[in-house]
């Protein structure tokens, strides 16, 4: 296969594995990085170069995770997501395994090139291993309350530090977003009950029942998450808008309209994640 065709093929495979997760990785990381550009007197070319470097970290960040996640969850994907590359036959299991090793090597190599990102890189590697290679990653508490919080820290801390040194305000907001994610990411499991049950996972809907988990998310997790945003100084940036978005999210969670509807609810949730980070970046630049 010609080199250009091979490169195009690999780009297509990268998109196939990762595009559904961009609104929870590359996009929010990029949005948060904009906030780190405030007050910098660097030339535009330097800022662009730093952002391009961040993209070289974010790309293997999500590719390494999605590859290993899908390599270790083929049985579930055959039920919940049969159109993914491995169950659909687009990529063989062995091919995905080879690519996961390559993505891991690139991801670690970027951090070794820029050691300031090594803590976040090692955190994400550990989080991915915890999720994909241990039984604790199959339990609702380990999967969401722990792993999504540590993953959010790795994503947001690296996205800021790739542009500018961290500040007390940026750290406070990162920790607030980690708490928000730990409480709310259970939303992703509402759409995958059938496959999760088949492989023995203990997600919130399987432990507390479908409607029970929806009540927990809507009336306990979402209000608590808003309180954490308030403690981090984020909710005050646009209280009416953020309150309304969380109310709409809760309304969607309570509706038992099928897995496809629940998937759209999860995507809406990731857009809220991006919006919150946009508010933070706008505030950093004095725009709100």
From Swiss-Prot:
UniProt keyword list: Membrane, Transferase, Transmembrane, Transmembrane helix
GO molecular function, one term: transferase activity, transferring alkyl or aryl (other than methyl) groups
Chief location of this protein within or outside the cell: membrane
EC numbers for this chain: 2.5.1.-
Keyword NAD found: no
Ranges that cross the membrane: 24-44, 51-71, 101-121, 145-165, 215-235, 268-288
InterPro entries cross-referenced by the UniProt entry: Prenyltransferase_related, UbiA_prenyltransferase, UbiA_sf
Cofactor: Mg(2+)
Membrane topology: Multi-pass membrane protein
Subcellular localization(s) per the UniProt record: Membrane
Keyword Transmembrane helix: yes
Family: Belongs to the UbiA prenyltransferase family.
Protein name in UniProt: Polyprenyl transferase eriF
The species this protein was found in: Hericium erinaceus
């Amino acid at each position: 296969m010609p080199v250009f065709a091979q490169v195009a093929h690999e780009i297509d495979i990268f998109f196939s594995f990762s595009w559904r997760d961009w609104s929870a990785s590359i996009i929010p990381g990029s949005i948060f990085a904009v906030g780190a550009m405030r007050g910098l007197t660097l030339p535009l070319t330097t800022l662009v170069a730093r952002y391009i470097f961040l993209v070289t970290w974010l790309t293997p960040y999500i590719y390494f995770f999605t590859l290993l996640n899908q390599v270790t969850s083929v049985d579930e994907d055959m039920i919940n997501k049969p159109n993914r590359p491995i169950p659909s036959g687009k990529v063989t299991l062995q091919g995905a395994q080879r690519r996961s090793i390559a993505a891991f090597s690139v991801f670690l190599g970027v951090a070794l090139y820029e050691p300031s990102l090594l803590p976040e890189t090692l955190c994400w590697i550990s989080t991915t291993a915890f999720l994909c290679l241990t039984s604790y990653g199959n339990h609702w508490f380990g999967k969401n309350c722990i792993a999504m919080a540590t993953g959010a820290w790795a994503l947001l801390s690296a996205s800021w530090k790739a542009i500018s040194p961290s500040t007390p305000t940026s750290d406070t907001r990162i920790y607030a977003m980690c708490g928000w994610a730990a409480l709310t990411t259970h939303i992703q499991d509402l759409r995958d009950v059938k496959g999760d049950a088949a492989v023995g996972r203990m997600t919130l809907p399987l432990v507390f029942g479908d409607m029970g988990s929806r009540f927990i998310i809507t009336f306990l997790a979402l209000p608590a998450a808003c309180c954490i945003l308030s403690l981090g100084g984020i909710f005050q940036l646009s209280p009416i808008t953020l309150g309304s978005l969380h109310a709409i999210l809760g309304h969607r969670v309570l509706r038992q309209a099928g897995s496809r509807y629940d998937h759209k609810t999860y995507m809406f949730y990731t857009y809220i994640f991006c919006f919150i980070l946009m508010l933070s970046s706008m505030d950093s630049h004095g725009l709100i």
